[in-house]
């Protein structure tokens, strides 16, 4: 019994680290895409496509939940309960149908917003199933996500006003991308993010291996 318990705790630690690392990378990228959607689309597409900016922003929000749901699905598969994933898909279909029925008379943006809410609801249900099958509790996963969600929201709030100060779209894109990187990484460093420290340590070790590895001539 103790061996099984130790294995379960080891898996939960691995799950937590995976979720934290995924959130650390994914959430700021999606937030950055949300913020820079305007300059990116205006630079790459013709003016008739500019109204698609809010759609792209909503898809970025929904993408956060989709990625995290996929990670949790892998945890459920590891636990040997793939039937749980099928149950979650039933919820997803039901929510999607409900959103379409409730919003089909509204504009397309409202329908897309409803589908983003669907992804959020599916992710919440997914967290509950993950907790049931793996022991990775709902509250535990929420606490693993909140620091990086908070940093991403802070970054977004600080970057959005820049759009009203710079008219040149290329300069705006570069400024927002650079400022966002500095704000996110800087704040994570100041607050002592363990994932950031682990990532920097991994990069340092890889660089050490790269510079210390023998060349073919030395062989």
Regions found by a protein language model. Name each.
Residues 214-219:
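A short, hydrophobic C-terminal helix/tail in secreted or cell-surface proteins
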Residues 131, 136-138, 145, 157-213:
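Membrane-proximal transmembrane or re-entrant/amphipathic helices at the cytosolic face
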Residues 30-35, 43, 97, 101, ...:
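Membrane-embedded alpha-helical segments of multi-pass transporters/permeases
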Residues 1-89:
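Specific pore-lining/lateral-gate transmembrane helices of multi-pass inner-membrane transport
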Residues 54-100, 104, 108-132, 176-181:
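Short runs within selected transmembrane alpha-helices of multi-pass transporters and secretion channels
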Residues 91-94, 147-159:
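Hydrophobic membrane-spanning alpha-helices of multi-pass integral membrane proteins
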Residues 54-55, 111, 144, 148, ...:
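Residue-level signature of transmembrane alpha-helical entry/exit and packing/kink sites
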Residues 36-38, 45-49, 103-105, 163, ...:
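Short helix-capping/hinge motifs at transmembrane helix termini and TM-loop junctions
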């Amino acid at each position: 019994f103790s061996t099984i318990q130790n294995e379960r705790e080891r898996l939960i630690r691995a799950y937590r680290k995976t979720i934290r690392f995924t959130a650390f990378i994914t959430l700021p990228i999606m937030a950055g895409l949300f913020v820079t959607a305007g300059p990116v689309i205006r630079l790459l597409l013709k003016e008739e496509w500019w109204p698609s900016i809010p759609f792209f922003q909503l898809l970025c929000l929904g993408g956060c939940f989709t990625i995290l749901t996929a990670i949790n699905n892998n945890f459920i598969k590891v636990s040997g309960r793939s039937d749980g994933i099928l149950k979650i898909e039933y919820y997803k279909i039901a929510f999607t149908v409900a959103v379409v029925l409730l919003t089909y008379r509204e504009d397309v943006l409202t329908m897309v917003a409803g589908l983003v809410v669907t992804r959020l609801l599916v992710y919440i249900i997914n967290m509950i199933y993950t907790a049931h099958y793996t022991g990775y509790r709902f509250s535990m996963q929420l606490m693993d996500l909140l620091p990086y969600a908070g940093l991403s929201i802070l970054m977004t709030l600080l970057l959005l006003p820049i759009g009203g100060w710079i008219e040149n779209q290329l300069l705006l894109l570069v400024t927002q991308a650079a400022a966002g990187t500095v704000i996110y990484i800087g704040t994570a460093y100041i607050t002592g993010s363990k994932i950031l420290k682990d990532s920097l340590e991994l990069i340092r070790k890889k660089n050490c291996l790269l510079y210390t590895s023998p060349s073919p001539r030395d062989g």
